[in-house]
Amino acid sequence: MPRVKRLAASHLSNSWNTIPHVTHHDEADITELEDFRAKLSDPVSGDKIKITPLAFIAKALTNNLKKFPTFNSSLDNISEGKITQKKYFHIGIAVDTPHGLMVPKIRNVDQKKIKEISEELKNVSELSRNLKIDKKEFFGGSITITSLGGIGGTYFTPIINYPEVAILGIGRSYKKQIFIKDKFLARTVLPISLSYDHRIIDGAEAAKSVSYTHLTLPTKRIV
């Protein structure tokens, strides 16, 4: 087994055996977001600007952490109930590489614009695949996003990246008929799977968190 996979296997096993995982599944209506992305263009050249949906999700998730700070924490001592509240917003991105799974961080997402986040996502993904990324980029995260959108599938149970307390799984978006104002409309929906540490996050808080995240996704306020 390659070294990266050995390290990942050990870390994932520890997380699964340590944290009581619960996964909350939902779907977000991203019709407006996809329409907005399709219309993005350079104001000077008029050329289309391609921004991955993951950049919007990372930004929306950061807003979520501000509203629900428990998700931006770590449980340091179970017996004493010591919880460390993080003051930064570093989003981990699970990257599938030929060497195994890597989770580099996009740091200070709250201070960056969508375009910056999108460019940084491409950069850290490429560095990870080429084994050129600094090891320090794998530590100090707030929460992790893992996306299977480019591969397929809908809902799954992502394993929390310990010592974080939650991870957001993203499936492949698809068209769905939704009944809105007395008629069915074709909408684009995104499957969401949020795994969380049930020792410090309860089901109601997780449900509120997911609802808030997908409510902020379709708006331009996060740009």
Regions found by a protein language model. Name each.
Residues M1-L215:
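C-terminal catalytic/motor cores of large multi-domain enzyme assemblies
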Residues H214, T219-V223:
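Single conserved hydrophobic/aromatic residue that forms the stacking wall/gate
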